[in-house]
């Protein structure tokens, strides 16, 4: 059936289900949702169940757009909104978009603008006609969030056309009578880095992640040139499980070589993805490395990105529904559940996950409506890869920092900008506040402060305890005075040239570049100082070499020659802060999964870890398993 006939049929069905006196003028697909156009937005606002009931009846996401002729002026609208919304919400800005009929309201306390069960939003629509969308005013100023919001506002018309094209492709008619499901491993199997998979059916091709192996020049990119993937315009959608570069660093490259479809991720992942992609190409340029794409491709990716919240069931292809669930790995990290066909098959891609409550996040979700196949990470899949309890890890970190400070030294902590940094920040803030370690400045360098600002913008993605602390007690640990952002080369040099006892968190986490290397060069030869590892160190990185006990580290000198740097500083590995599940948690995650899966495939770990985990799941849980290898295709159904 042609798409115009599909829309006409939907319009007739909607009109039959609307209450008496409520009318629509048109319907159109915008991305995964169906948009209803009406001259009577106030009637829809009167009854909050109209849209909900239609969505349930049609089994699709529905949004409403008002006719521009029935909208109040922006000036009158602002006056009315400020009468309806409590002043305690602290509204900081408005943006009116006549094309969509939406008013974007930025407020410090979005919940007060929304009201109980959306009552205040409906009241706003009843009085002004506009559809209010609420975003949080970042409690810490974020250039990334500010620029993304401005960019999206400035490109609304183009984005609307993109969404229209995407929507029509999603809702096209299924033509194949065959029924099969396959997964192709394109990267990240029996290795850590360049994660990428293709989920295929007779109707659809979905790319899950497209990462870069930052620790390797030879095996940096996934196998995107294979016939299953290329040309890229045959892919229906790209899914990004989380914002680390080894899962999303090459998504803009897809657009450079012909991809024009949607990118699905959570809202925090979108913000962090932009931050890390721009930093990635900036660092590559400064280090004289090949730049895989320009900043314009990052912008194009952003235009095509469709953010989805957890638990939001969404059509992404004619025969596939996607639902994101909390993965507990980093901010916005998602376990991706794919419902294929009409109950034909269900696949769960875990991405990276943590099956334990941490300072930042709740444990990874492992309860689903249905699941037959699980594709699980195996970073710590080795039989002896057990991590200490988080409380023990925190005590270890406190002891290391305390001892270093008391002997007049500096604790340098290489950390990813996203995830471990914020976990460590919360522990350090509490430790200083309670007097468990001396009160010293904690310097944050290399995007860590900007990433922290994005965390503060999305508190609803943090765990319950942290949300209560922020919302109910008004205590935001990220705003502590002990944290000192390092926002320039001059500020960094001041710390290096005038060394005083302190803690330095700096990127990159594996010491393969970034400002941490400047601190390392400056402080490595002083035995009073300590290098503290709190995250995974991949093979081939300087971090892994130091962990192996190297006492002389080859470094590039000022004239480009190689110089050997003597390692006199203490080296401490504080296990337990990892955002990955350890061996015990990996096994428990599968063991406690509901319903019980039929098969489990392992990936994202070295060969021994992937094989060992797969073998143990098979032997102990009696579930079919396989350690996937790059470039192999497995039929699931």
Swiss-Prot record:
Zn(2+) 1 binds at residues 242, 244, 329, 352. Pfam families: Beta-Casp, KH_2, KH_TffA, Lactamase_B, RMMBL. SMART domains: Beta-Casp, KH, Lactamase_B. Residues 72-139 are annotated as: KHb. Keywords: DNA-binding, Endonuclease, Exonuclease, Hydrolase, Metal-binding, Nuclease, RNA-binding, Transcription, Transcription regulation, Transcription termination, Zinc. Residues 579-637 are annotated as: Metallo-beta-lactamase C-terminus. PROSITE patterns: KH_TYPE_1. Residues 4-71 are annotated as: KHa. Binds 2 Zn(2+) ions, which are required for nuclease activity. GO terms for biological process: DNA-templated transcription termination. GO terms for molecular function: DNA binding; exonuclease activity; identical protein binding; RNA binding; RNA endonuclease activity; zinc ion binding. Residues 180-383 are annotated as: Metallo-beta-lactamase N-terminus. The keyword Transmembrane does not apply. Residues 384-578 are annotated as: Beta-Casp. Its cofactor is Zn(2+). It comes from the Archaea. It is an enzyme of class 3 (hydrolase). Zn(2+) 2 binds at residues 246-247, 352, 604. Its EC number is 3.1.-.-. Homodimer. Interacts with RNA polymerase (RNAP), interacts with the Spt4-Spt5 complex. Belongs to the metallo-beta-lactamase superfamily. RNA-metabolizing metallo-beta-lactamase-like family. FttA subfamily. HAMAP family: FttA (MF_00870). Terminates transcription on the whole genome. Termination is linked to FttA-mediated RNA cleavage and does not require NTP hydrolysis. Cleaves endonucleolytically at the RNA exit channel of RNA polymerase (RNAP); the 5'-3' exonuclease activity of this protein degrades the nascent RNA released from RNAP. PANTHER family: CLEAVAGE AND POLYADENYLATION SPECIFICITY FACTOR, CLEAVAGE AND POLYADENYLATION SPECIFICITY FACTOR FAMILY MEMBER. This is Transcription termination factor FttA. It comes from Methanosarcina mazei (strain ATCC BAA-159 / DSM 3647 / Goe1 / Go1 / JCM 11833 / OCM 88).
């Amino acid at each position: 059936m042609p798409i115009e006939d599909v829309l006409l049929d939907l319009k007739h069905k909607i009109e039959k289900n609307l209450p008496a006196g409520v009318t629509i003028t048109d319907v159109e697909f915008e991305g995964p949702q169906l948009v209803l156009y009406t001259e009577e937005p106030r009637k829809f606002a009167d009854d909050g169940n109209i849209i909900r009931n239609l969505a349930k009846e049609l089994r699709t996401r529905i949004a409403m757009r008002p006719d521009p002729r029935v909208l109040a002026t922006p000036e009158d609208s602002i006056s009315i909104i400020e009468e309806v919304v409590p002043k305690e919400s602290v509204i900081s800005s408005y943006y009116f978009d006549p094309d969509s009929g939406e008013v974007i309201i930025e407020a410090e306390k979005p919940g007060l603008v929304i009201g109980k069960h959306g009552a205040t939003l409906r009241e706003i629509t009843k009085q002004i006609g506009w559809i209010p969308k609420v975003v949080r005013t970042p409690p810490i100023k974020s250039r990334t969030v500010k620029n993304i919001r401005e960019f999206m506002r400035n490109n609304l018309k183009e984005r609307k056309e993109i969404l229209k094209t995407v929507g029509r492709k999603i809702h096209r008619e299924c033509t194949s009578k065959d029924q099969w499901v396959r997964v192709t491993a394109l990267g990240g199997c029996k290795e850590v880095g360049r994660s990428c998979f293709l989920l295929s059916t007779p109707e659809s091709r979905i790319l899950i992640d497209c990462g870069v192996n930052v620790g390797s020049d030879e095996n940096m990119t996934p196998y995107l040139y294979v016939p299953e993937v290329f040309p890229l315009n045959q892919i229906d959608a790209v899914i990004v499980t989380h914002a680390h570069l080894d899962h999303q660093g090459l998504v803009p490259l897809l657009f450079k070589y012909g991809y024009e479809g949607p990118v699905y991720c959570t809202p925090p992942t979108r913000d962090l993805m932009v931050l890390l992609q721009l930093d990635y190409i900036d660092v590559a340029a400064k280090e004289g490395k090949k730049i895989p794409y320009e900043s314009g491709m990052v912008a194009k990716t952003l235009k095509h990105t469709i953010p989805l919240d957890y638990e939001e069931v969404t059509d992404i292809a004619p025969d596939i529904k996607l639902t994101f669930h909390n993965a507990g790995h980093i901010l916005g990290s998602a376990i991706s559940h794919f419902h294929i066909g009409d109950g034909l098959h269900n696949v769960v891609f875990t991405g990276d996950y943590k099956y334990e409550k941490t300072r930042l996040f709740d444990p990874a979700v492992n309860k689903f409506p249905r699941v037959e196949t699980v594709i699980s990470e195996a970073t710590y899949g080795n039989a002896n890869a057990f991590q200490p309890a988080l409380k023990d890890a925190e005590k270890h970190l406190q002891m290391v920092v305390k001892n270093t400070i008391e002997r007049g030294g500096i604790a340098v902590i290489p950390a990813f900008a996203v995830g471990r940094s914020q976990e460590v920040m919360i522990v350090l803030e509490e430790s200083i506040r309670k007097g468990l370690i001396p009160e010293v400045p904690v310097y944050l360098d290399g995007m860590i402060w900007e990433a922290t600002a994005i965390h503060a913008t999305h508190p609803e993605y943090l765990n319950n305890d942290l949300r209560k602390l922020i919302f109910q007690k008004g205590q935001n640990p990220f705003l502590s005075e002990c944290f000192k952002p390092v926002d320039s080369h001059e500020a960094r040099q001041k710390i290096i040239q005038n060394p005083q006892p302190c803690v330095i968190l700096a990127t990159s986490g594996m010491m393969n570049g970034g400002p941490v290397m400047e601190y390392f060069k400056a402080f490595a030869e002083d035995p009073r100082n300590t290098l503290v590892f709190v995250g995974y160190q991949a093979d081939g990185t300087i971090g892994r070499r130091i962990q192996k006990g190297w006492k002389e580290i080859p470094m590039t000198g000022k004239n480009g020659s190689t110089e050997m740097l003597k390692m006199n500083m203490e080296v401490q590995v504080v296990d337990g802060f990892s955002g990955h599940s350890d061996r015990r948690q990996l096994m428990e995650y599968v063991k406690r999964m509901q319903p019980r899966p039929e098969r489990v495939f392992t990936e994202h770990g070295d060969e021994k870890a992937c094989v060992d985990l797969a073998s143990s799941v098979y032997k102990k849980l009696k579930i079919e398993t396989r350690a996937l290898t790059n470039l192999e295709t497995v039929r699931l159904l």
